[in-house]
Curated annotation (Swiss-Prot):
Organism of provenance: Escherichia coli O157:H7
Protein name as catalogued: Probable fimbrial chaperone EcpE
Similarity remark: Belongs to the EcpB/EcpE family.
Entry keyword annotation includes Cell membrane: no
Signal sequence, start to end: 1-27
Length: 236
């Protein structure tokens, strides 16, 4: 389980592999940093956009992880379990294209998680002189980490909500997002987003009070309390 402050806030996990960081407005764009492969399909697409002013090459690295988080354990995926195509993309400035991910793993009731790193590489090596006399790249390599969740092939979406104790529990075998907005007129920025994996439980005082509280599962909003008029927030 992990929490994100602000319902509409997106925190990009960017790593500039050089001594000079590029402006974030000109970095790779891949949309939501957590994406899922539904239980009824065996592939999912991820769009990559080149927001730079010159061409870039895009490559992917995949690690299997036990559970997303700061203490996650990364391992090499079983051969053939998760494939992707194409091997790399070459995009001109402003262009976009899709990577496709194909799952050929076990058809069971267990959810699986993968860390997918998108690597953006300049097609040319431009440098400038640093104050110390050395040279640094003016077009760095940028790596953006995302999480791919392969939902169980035998999926069970279940949850429980206890308003008396202010508790939401994931009693199924697949993840969902919980949106908590205190009060009926609070803004998106005042809300919190919680990502609940199987068996995760959230205890929050706000859940005992009136507010717009939703679950988001497969891009669908599920209102869990009737204390406010229905007004679905953004799922970002």
């Amino acid at each position: 389980m992990f929490r994100r402050r602000g319902v509409t806030l997106t925190k990009a996990l960017l790593t500039a592999v050089c001594m000079l960081a590029a402006p974030l407005t000109q970095a790779i764009s891949v949309g939501n940093l957590t994406f899922s492969l539904p239980s009824e399909t065996d592939f999912v697409s991820k769009r990559v956009v080149n927001n730079n002013k010159s061409a870039r090459i895009y490559r992917i690295a995949i690690s299997a992880i036990d559970s997303p988080g700061s203490s996650e354990l990364r391992t090499r995926p079983v051969d053939g379990e998760l494939l992707f195509a194409p091997r790399q993309l070459a995009l001109q400035a402003g262009e976009s294209e899709y990577f496709k991910f194909y799952y050929h793993g076990p058809q069971d009731n267990r959810e699986r998680y993968y860390r997918v790193s998108f690597r953006e590489v300049p097609t040319r090596n431009l440098t400038k002189r640093s104050p110390t006399g050395g040279e640094v790249s003016t077009e760095p390599v940028v790596v953006m980490d995302t999480i791919l969740v392969v939902r169980p092939r035998q999926v069970q979406f279940k949850w429980s909500f206890d308003q008396v104790t202010g508790t939401v529990s994931n009693t199924g075998n697949t993840w969902f997002k919980l949106l908590i907005k205190p009060g009926c007129d609070s803004t998106e920025e005042e809300g919190d987003a919680w990502y609940l994996r199987p068996e995760d439980v959230v205890h929050q005082p706000e859940l005992r009070q009136p507010g717009n509280h939703y679950l988001v599962y497969n891009d669908k909003f599920i209102k869990i309390s009737d204390s406010c008029p229905a007004k679905p927030p953004s799922a970002d």
